[in-house]
Amino acid sequence: PKEIIERMEDGRAVLYASEHSAAATERRAQRTWPKFATAYASVRRSEEAGIRELAETAFHVQAPLGTVDAQDRREQGWFVVRAFDHDEVDAALSEEPVTPQDIHVGDRIRLTRSQITDWRVILPEEMYGPDRSDALLAAIDRLLGLA
């Protein structure tokens, strides 16, 4: 247990969700993808530079990295969205993988919607995910001065 705690504190631990939990998160992310895309487009189109900059920093997606291991598990990586194109995003890996991979922090890849297992939007006031997609759209409206 001590080694596990130390690895978690050092950011060297990989935590695997149960298959049921991971599948539920992925379904929510897929179901709410249009709201995530709408939020991104609204921020990107803003006339205010400070808000437009959020399109480069606030939108994150999670997707599997590499291949499955001997226990049929696969590490998930978080990426910062750099560009949106319908059901695809260009994104940069935001954290170094814990398991050996051919991708590293800052590497950019194109991800399709079907590869996305979760998403997050980190606004100045708080963080939003698929379970709070309606609240995200309301927050974007407030940010843009529409509400």
Where are the language model's segments positioned?
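Mixed-charge, low-complexity intrinsically disordered regions
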Residues: 1-147
